[in-house]
Amino acid sequence: MSNQFLDLITKRRTIYAIGKNIEQSPERLTDLIQTAIKQSPSAFNSQSSRAVILFNTEHEKFWGIVADKLKSYAKDEASAAKTTAKMASFAAGVGTVLFFEDQTVVQALQEQFPSYADNFPV
């Protein structure tokens, strides 16, 4: 690995104040995400990782649904308010990426490699 890459990883920081001030278009972000998923190594080269990429109203709608559901689990008003504020901070961003594993690929691997079948579901 190049020192430049390792330096970038070392200097990386989480941004907590999420906002909509980005330089890339949604199309460019989608392309970057799709490329990263496609080029990421996977067990048995299964390429089973998938992503749903949400922008604009779909992104905001998603976080509204999550906030409503999580509020129903809150023990009191203070907890509900904290949860609502946290979900609002996520909704303040440009988009959301939801990662998942394609279970049809996993099932095919279980059939193709029966001796490893119990190890595939993650």
How does the language model describe each region?
Residues 34-41, 83-86:
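Short secondary-structure capping/turn segments at boundaries of alpha-helices and beta-strands
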Residues 27, 42, 59:
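Active-site loop/lid in soluble adenylation, ligation, and acyl-transfer enzymes
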Residues 12-13, 38, 50, 59:
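Basic side chains
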Residues 48-122:
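Glycine/small-residue-rich phosphate/adenosyl-binding loop
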Residues 1-35, 45-47:
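Specificity-determining recognition surfaces
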